[in-house]
């Protein structure tokens, strides 16, 4: 019964066009639906972790992704004093790297592409939107990303414990897969 329900849910998720999805997540997909899609049709999908590899090193990784292609890379020479952090800049090779990853898998720009960042909002959604604007019509992003949203109040305020891939019981590890992680030239 669980398999039938999962198959029906996955089938429904694949048939609903993005235009009919929830306005807040017009082309978002849940972590669970992403996992199920990768299990059922992973050879037809390119699942990309768009975080900077250094972030992955400290936060965790799921080997369910096909590849790490950062959308933004932290520039360790550009300090943002106002926000007390290094400034991230768009990866100038992002589109070319996605094209190469698709080609390596025998896919084209019409394939489903799913991006995932830490929370879904800062890089996941923008990277999927950027891909759509650059000819990848079926790009989506994992809503709430890898770690999810922060808890706003109480003892665990500030912790990312309420949603996202990591908090959904899906496979992840503290170790990275070196075969999938982006390396700078």
Listing of model-derived features with the role each one plays in the protein:
Residues 46-51, 69:
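Short hydrophobic beta-strand that contains or immediately precedes a catalytic carboxylate
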Residues 54:
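Glycine-rich nucleotide phosphate-binding loop and flanking beta-alpha elements
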Residues 116-117:
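Short, surface-exposed ligand- or partner-binding patches at beta-edge/loop junctions that are enriched
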């Amino acid at each position: 019964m669980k398999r039938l329900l999962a198959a029906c849910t996955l089938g429904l998720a694949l048939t609903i066009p993005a235009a009919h999805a929830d306005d807040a997540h017009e082309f978002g997909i849940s972590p669970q639906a992403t996992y199920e899609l990768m299990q059922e049709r992973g050879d037809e999908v390119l699942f990309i972790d768009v975080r900077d590899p250094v972030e992955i090193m400290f936060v965790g990784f799921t080997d369910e992704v096909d590849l790490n292609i950062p959308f933004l890379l932290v520039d360790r020479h550009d300090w943002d004093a106002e926000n007390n952090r290094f400034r991230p800049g768009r990866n100038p090779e992002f589109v070319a790297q996605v094209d190469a990853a698709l080609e390596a898998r025998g896919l084209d720009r019409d394939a489903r592409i799913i991006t995932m960042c830490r929370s879904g909002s800062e890089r996941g959604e923008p990277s999927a939107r950027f891909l759509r604007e650059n000819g990848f019509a079926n790009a989506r992003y994992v809503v709430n990303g890898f770690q999810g949203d922060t808890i706003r109040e109480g003892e665990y305020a500030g912790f990312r414990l309420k949603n996202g891939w990591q908090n959904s019981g899906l496979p992840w590890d503290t170790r990275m897969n070196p075969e999938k992680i982006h390396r700078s030239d």
